[in-house]
């Protein structure tokens, strides 16, 4: 399962509830992008969330 190396975001599981409160398992997936960034001074392809990219927490190479 892919995981954001900056924020640690990953797939979350829970229940979808109908009006009658029936439950069905479902998952919420983060918007992960595979990008090249500098990790320890070297370029590396890693999974980063779109939120981390937009907020400027990480810089593309």
From Swiss-Prot:
A Pfam family annotated for this UniProt entry: Ribosomal_L28
Lineage: Bacteria, Bacillati, Bacillota, Bacilli, Lactobacillales
Gene Ontology molecular function, alphabetical: structural constituent of ribosome
Family annotation (SUPFAM superfamilies): L28p-like (SSF143800)
Gene name tied to this protein: rpmB
Entry keywords, A to Z: Ribonucleoprotein, Ribosomal protein
Record family assignment: Belongs to the bacterial ribosomal protein bL28 family.
Protein name according to UniProt: Large ribosomal subunit protein bL28
GO BP annotation list: translation
Keyword Plastid assigned: no
PANTHER family the UniProt entry points to: 50S RIBOSOMAL PROTEIN L28 (PTHR39080), LARGE RIBOSOMAL SUBUNIT PROTEIN BL28A (PTHR39080:SF1)
GO cellular component: ribonucleoprotein complex; ribosome
């Amino acid at each position: 399962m892919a995981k954001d190396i900056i924020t640690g975001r990953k797939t979350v599981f829970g229940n979808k509830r109908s009006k009658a409160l029936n439950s069905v398992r479902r998952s919420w997936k983060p918007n992960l992008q595979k990008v090249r960034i500098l990790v320890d001074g070297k370029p590396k392809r890693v999974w980063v969330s779109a939120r981390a990219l937009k907020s400027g927490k990480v810089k593309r190479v």
